């Protein structure tokens, strides 16, 4: 598999952190995280989510990212999961927090772009669920101009009157 991976890697960004003598320190970091040689020589696919416990639109994204990672692995890629920030309008309304809402969209795009560029990922799957995180994730994909897939995390579960 290494030879096959090397041929694929010669055209990918991840070659800078996985192929050749100059990348030995990078590979040592991957081995320290439990990655195998086969995983290191496959394309690296970032799996970015806006998972957090601040709002119901983000709460399921961690679980969804695990499914995405299984899909990437089954397609002979190496998933690298990371999260970014999010500010939810539903909780930021009516106080100073609203000043952070629109700015969070830019921060989401910036942090995803920095993570993907900094770690030389070859592709990106973004999973988001709230109003500012959706465009923030998509903006990062446009900036990066790499193979990308956006997944909408889904709607919030219906309100239960018991909790009011």
Language-model-detected regions and their locations in the chain:
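A short, small-residue-rich loop immediately preceding and capping a beta-strand
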Residues: 115-137, 148-152
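Gly-rich Lys/Arg/Thr-decorated short loops/hinges at beta-loop-alpha junctions or inter-strand turns
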Residues: 6-14, 45-52, 85-99
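A glycine- and small-aliphatic-rich helix-loop capping segment at beta-alpha/alpha-beta transitions
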Residues: 63-67, 99, 139-150, 157
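Glycine-rich oxoanion-binding loops at beta->alpha junctions
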Residues: 25-31, 78-126
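Conserved small/polar residues in nucleotide/adenosyl-binding loops
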Residues: 162-164
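N-terminal amphipathic/basic leader segments beginning at the initiator methionine
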Residues: 2-39
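Glycine-rich phosphate/diphosphate-binding loop of Rossmann-like nucleotide-binding domains
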Residues: 37-41, 46, 52-81
């Amino acid at each position: 598999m290494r030879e096959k991976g090397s041929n694929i890697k010669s055209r990918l960004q991840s070659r800078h952190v996985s192929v050749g003598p100059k990348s030995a320190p990078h590979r040592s970091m991957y081995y320290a995280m439990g990655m195998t040689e086969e995983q290191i020589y496959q394309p690296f696919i970032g799996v970015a989510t806006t998972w957090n416990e601040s709002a119901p639109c983000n709460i399921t994204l961690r679980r969804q990212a695990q499914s995405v990672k299984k899909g990437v692995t089954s397609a002979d890629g190496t998933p690298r999961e990371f999260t970014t920030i999010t500010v939810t309008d539903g909780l930021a309304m009516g106080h100073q927090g609203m000043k952070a809402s629109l700015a969070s969209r830019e921060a989401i795009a910036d942090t995803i772009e920095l993570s993907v560029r900094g770690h030389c990922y070859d592709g990106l799957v973004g999973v988001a669920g709230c109003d500012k995180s959706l465009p923030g994730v998509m903006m990062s994909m446009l900036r990066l101009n790499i193979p990308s897939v956006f997944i909408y995390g889904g709607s919030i579960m219906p309100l239960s009157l018991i909790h009011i």
